[in-house]
């Protein structure tokens, strides 16, 4: 599993935007699909809200391939 850290520039970032920003998918539409299909876990729980507000301290798992830790700015 690959581990990434993401430092927030604002108070939060929407989940699908973060996935796209980190180039884990080719498009925003693909990001929305993997979230909607339940491939993303947030703090151990499946997160299907595409626009969920991701904040400092959250830990995301995208599939079984990537773990992302969110840090404050």
Label the predicted regions.
Residues 2-4, 38, 64-68:
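Generic structural motif recognizing short loop/turn segments at the entrances and edges of beta-strands
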Residues 13-56:
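A basic, amphipathic helix-loop patch mediating RNA/tRNA/ribosome contacts
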Residues 49-73:
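C-terminal structural segments of small proteins and small subunits
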């Amino acid at each position: 599993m690959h581990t990434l850290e993401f430092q927030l520039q604002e108070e939060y970032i929407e989940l699908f935007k973060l996935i796209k920003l980190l180039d884990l998918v080719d498009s925003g539409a693909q990001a929305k699909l993997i979230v909607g299909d339940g491939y993303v876990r947030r703090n151990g729980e499946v997160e299907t809200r595409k626009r969920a507000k991701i904040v400092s301290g959250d830990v995301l798992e995208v599939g079984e391939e990537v773990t992302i830790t969110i840090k404050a700015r």
